[in-house]
Amino acid sequence: LSANRLRESASPYLLQHADNPVHWRLWGREALEEARARDVPVLLSIGYAACHWCHVMAHESFEDEAVAAVMNRDFVCVKVDREERPDVDHHYMGALHAMGSQGGWPLTMFLSPEGAPFFGGTYWPPAPRYGQPSFRQVLASVTNVWLTKREAALGNGAAITAHLSSLADARAPGALTSADLDAAGFALLRLIDTFNGGIGRAPKFPNAPIFRFLGSEYGRRRDPRFRDAVRGLLDALCAGGIYDHVGGGFARYSVDAEWHVPHFEKMLYDNAQILELLAFAHAETPRPIYAARARDTFGWLMREMKAGEAFAASLDADQEGEEGKFYVWMAPEIDDALGAEAAAFKAAYDVRPEGNWEGRNVLRLKAPADPTLDASLSGARAKLAALRDRRARPGLDDKVLTDWNGLTIAALVRGAGVFEAPEMLRAAQAAFDALDRGQRDAGGWLVHATRGGRIGAAGLLDDSAGFARAALALFEATGAPNYLETAEAEARAARVRFGAADGGLYLTADDAQDGPAVRPRVFHDNATPSGIGVMAEVFVKLHHLTDAPEWREAAERLIGAFAGADPSELANAPSLLAAHDNLARGGCLVVEGAALRAAALAHADSTIVVFPLDRTLWPNGLPGGRPAPATTPSAMLCRGQTCSLPVYDVDALLSLVRA
C-alpha cells in the first residue's frame, strides 16, 4: 500500500504527480477504507493541469521527501483532478466556503475516514509567509487536532455535511416573473466596471454566463446599458493582454483590473463561451474586430486544442517551470524579428525596453482594438508566431470533457452562422460525431471524461445538457432530423438519470459510484453555465421546436424547482433566468430557402430557435402538427400553435424576429 497509485489514472493532471514521493491514492471507497483501517484522516488535494499555484505547491511540498514522509505517515493522501471529478470538487469547495474561506485551487481539505470535511484551505507555502502558516505547520496542527480533539473535528465535519445537504434539499416550488429578471439584471449591472469592462476588481474573469444573460436582457428590455456592458467586456478582452495577440485564444483571467496581464492558462470552456459572446454581439451590431478575434480563436482551437476530432481541455500556464514564459517578449527579440516593422509594433502593443510585466512584455493594445491597425500588423504577428513556435510549448491537457466540448460545438455553430464561416460548422459536426462515438460507456450512457479512448469519469448532468444543447445547435444549422432526435433522446434520459421528484435535476446520476456524500443540485453558474441552466434551455428549445407538452412541462417544473430561491441566489443563476426568459417570449422560426436560412442563423435574438425546413426530410409535416408554409422560400415565426403570416425576403424576416 506504500506506492503512489496515480499511474493507474488517465488524467494528465494526476499523472503529473505520479512520481511524487507522496503515496497518493485515487478518489474512491478504497482510500476511505484505508483511512478507516489506519485510523488517520484523509488529506484531499484537488487541482487541475493548467493551474499555476497547483504546480507551485507540488514543487514546494509534494516533491519534498521530508514533507511527503509526514503526509504518508499521518494521512491517507488523495489526489483529484477537478476537471475529471467536478462533483467531488463542488462538494468540497462548498465545504471550504462553509468554513468561511474564499476558495480556489489547489484545494486542500482534511476529511474523516467517512469523507466528512473538518478543515481546509487552498495553497500553503513551504515556510510561514504573508501571515500564512507553512504547510508542515498545517499538517502538524491537523494531526494534533485528530489525536486530541477528534470529537470536535468530527462534529465540525458532520455540521458542514449537514449544511451541504440542506443546500441540496428541494425548495418550495414557485414561478419566476419578469420582476425576477429585472432584479437580477440590475443587480448584475451594478457590478459592472464601466471604465475597464467586466465585473469587479482584480483578479478579473470573463464571467461569460453573466454576460450572455445581460445580452438577453438587452434583447428583452432594449436598455442600452445591458448592451454596453457586453460590449465593454468584449472590447477589453479583444485589446487586453488576456488575449493572445500572436496565437489567438483567451487566457483564463487577468491579474489586474485593466485586463493587462493574464494568468496564462487557456481553458477550452472560456474560449468557447467568449467566441459565442463575440458572435452574439457581432450579430447585434457588427464590429470587424469581433469577427477577427473569433476567427483567430477558432484557428487556435484547430491548431493547438484538437484531441482527435474533439477538443482538449486546457493549455498550461507554465513552461519550464516559469509562468507565461511561452507568451512574453523582450524588446530586443521583437527588434531582431521585425526589423523596420518593430517600432510601429512596439508602439501599438505597449512593448517597453524595461518590460511591462516583471521585466518582460505581455502584448496588449494601448488603444481600443482597431481593425485597420490589427490587419496592418498581421504580418508582424505571423513572424513572431513563427519565432515563438521554436520555444518549449505549454503542456496540453488532452483529455476530452463532454460538457466543455458541448459548449464549444454550440459556439462554433453560432460563429459559423454569424461570421459566415462554414469551416466552423464542419469542425462542430466532426466534434459532435466524436463525442457521440467516443464519450459513451458500455451501456451507451454519456461519460464525462476520456483520454486516449480510456474513460476517466462517469457522466454528469452537465455532460447530458451540453451534448443535447450542441445537438440542437447543429439541428438549427443543418435541419438534419437526427440531431433533433438525439437531443430529445438525451433530454429524456437525463430526466430519468438525474431527475428529482420536484422536477429539479441532480448533478450526479442515480447510479453514480464513488460520489460525494451529498448528491448536489447545482443551479448557480460559475465559469461555465450550470447543467440545470443548460438543460432548462434544452427543454425550452425542444418545446419551441416540437410544441410537445412534455417539454414545456419539463421546462416549467425545472425552472419552478429553483424559482423560490433568494433573489441573491437567482442573480448567481443567469443561465436559468435566461431559460425562463426564452420560455416566456421565445419562439420557433421556420425557414425554407438558403438566403432566409442564412439570415435566420445570423440573427441576434437568443430566444428564437431556428427550424430549417427541408420538405423531403419532413414528408408528414412539422412536429406538433404545425403547417408548413405554402410557398417557398419563406419563413414564419411560431409560438405554440400560433404562427405568423409567412414572409418571403430577408428584410421582412429580420423585421419579424425584431418585432
Regions found by a protein language model. Give the residues of each.
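Glycine-rich phosphate/oxyanion-binding loops and their immediately adjacent helices
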Residues: 412, 417, 427-429, 471
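Replace the tail clause
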Residues: 1-411, 415-418, 452, 559-659
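Long, polar/charge-rich, low-hydrophobicity segments
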Residues: 303-306, 437-464, 472-620
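Glycine-rich, acidic and aromatic/proline-enriched surface loops and short helix-turn segments
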Residues: 236-243, 430-438
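Inter-helical turn/loop segments and adjacent helix faces that build the functional surface
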Residues: 217-221, 281-289, 415-422, 474-481, ...
